[in-house]
Amino acid sequence: MSYAYLFKYIIIGDTGVGKSCLLLQFTDKRFQPVHDLTIGVEFGARMINIDGKQIKLQIWDTAGQESFRSITRSYYRGAAGALLVYDITRRETFNHLASWLEDARQHANPNMTIMLIGNKCDLTHRRAVTTEEGEQFAKEHGLIFLETSARTAHNVEEAFINTAKEIYKKIQDGVFDVSNESYGIKVGYGGGNAGPQTVKPGEGGAAKSSSCC
């Protein structure tokens, strides 16, 4: 299947906030409660439709550990969108957002669209960060904001697609030079290998972790 545009995404945030689970829910529509800890960077892809145009999302899921931050930073370059994820049940993951955002702003292109995601919103009884706090952080830093649950799929589609809509709007407004692929946008040529292909998260050598929801 051909596509009009390809958008590159990066998913960032602390270890265990559910980055890999969000990707798996979006690409495969399934939840994996026990998930391999991401080592380095993993990859997924899916086709979506915006305004009647086929858009291919190419999504890089990064490791949250500090030891992999240098690898993660190299993927900021050439990303049109970023999903910055925290866990609403773990206050420290919210407190670390400023550091992640600083990294993104320092290493990414200045027009990258950033979606702030408060994940695991199904665990309301364990909530440690209010929705209002997430909204306020997003407002202060010019981010889009949603709360999601990779377990129930709540708002997962919306998180990825709304980010793409914002990128598409920037293209329409002339913000991006789409001939420059360093912006994380590639114009499609109707090639034969444009269909949704996913390298499923968890494949490859990794250590087991059950902290993903």
UniProtKB/Swiss-Prot annotation:
Bilayer topology term: Lipid-anchor
SMART domains from the UniProt entry: RAB, RAN, RAS, RHO
Keywords noted in UniProt: Cell membrane, GTP-binding, Lipoprotein, Membrane, Nucleotide-binding, Prenylation, Protein transport, Transport
GO cellular component: plasma membrane
Sites of S-geranylgeranyl cysteine lipidation: C212, C213
Lineage top rank: taxon: Eukaryota
Annotated region (Disordered), positions in chain: 194-213
UniProt-listed GO biological process terms: protein transport
Pfam families: Ras
Motif (Effector region): 35-43
The keyword Lipoprotein is assigned to this record: yes
Binding locations of GTP: 13-21, 61-65, 119-122, 149-151
Protein name: GTP-binding protein YPTC4
Organism, scientific name: Chlamydomonas reinhardtii
Native organism taxonomy: Eukaryota, Viridiplantae, Chlorophyta, core chlorophytes, Chlorophyceae
